[in-house]
């Protein structure tokens, strides 16, 4: 595995804490929409929101990837979905972020997410054999997610 950096600029090791997921099999589109929504939340509020998404009580608003996505009755959400697998991975990432903050001696109740970014990872190419000697490509895009929090 290669050497990974962070896309967050202005990182101060005394004020910020960060965590990342690398090469996970989750949708990069779902990860982007979740990242956009939890940025600015406290860690506890983000965890409660993601738990509600897994229980299908609150929808993640889709702002960019919203074609053919149904409307939801949540306030402030026009088009939205319930990406359970991505939300579960984000909860694990929040646990990692809290562990890193605890190691640094930060107050966990005052952590606010200031950077949440999702990137496309590597492409895994596979092929499905079809009739008459043809084959259909089946590509799988892995995802990188980065979280940065600041003690407010």
Curated annotation (Swiss-Prot):
GO cellular component: cytosolic large ribosomal subunit
GO molecular function, one term: structural constituent of ribosome
Swiss-Prot/TrEMBL keywords: Ribonucleoprotein, Ribosomal protein, RNA-binding, rRNA-binding
Gene Ontology biological process terms, A to Z: cytoplasmic translation
Family: Belongs to the universal ribosomal protein uL22 family.
Function: This protein binds specifically to 23S rRNA. It makes multiple contacts with different domains of the 23S rRNA in the assembled 50S subunit and ribosome.
HAMAP family reported for this sequence: Ribosomal_uL22_A (MF_01331_A)
Assembly and binders: Part of the 50S ribosomal subunit.
Record's protein name: Large ribosomal subunit protein uL22
Organism field: Cenarchaeum symbiosum (strain A)
